[in-house]
Amino acid sequence: DVRYRVPNVNQCKECHAAEDKITPIGPKARNLNKEFEFNDGEFNQLTYWMNRQIIDDYPMELVSPVDWTDESQNINDRVRSYLDVNCGHCHSPTGNANSTGLYLHLDETRDIHLGLYKKPVATGRGSGGLKYSIVPGKPDESILLHRMISLDPGVMMPESGRALSH
């Protein structure tokens, strides 16, 4: 049983604002850049679509996420992939949370923008009295985990849409 309410425009902007425009959160090429089973065999999805002229082209040099639920993958890659798909749309230079300086999209490489020992700038009481966004190896000292597990509407992240299936 799922209860859904239609959000108002301001609530839509919470997630769908990018560069001051409301935009859909849709598939990114990097999330589609993987093997997929088609009727005629298993192929890279983007290459398959390009060969069938469904798309014109795609960037060949893609940083693609790993399956964050796959325990055989590198833990850093798993965490980065999870944060990219669940947080990176808002937490990017063009996203609604750009003023935080916490950029969780997969292309980000600067430790400070990834939250490592980054002091909060816009969390208010969301910091829970903690000092840094992410303290490597110490999740209980990290604001990021505090906000992800909180049920307090003024603290929790994401602010709405807590579970996503990808």
What feature does the model see in each segment?
Residues 1-166:
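Sequence context surrounding c-type heme c attachment/ligation sites in exported
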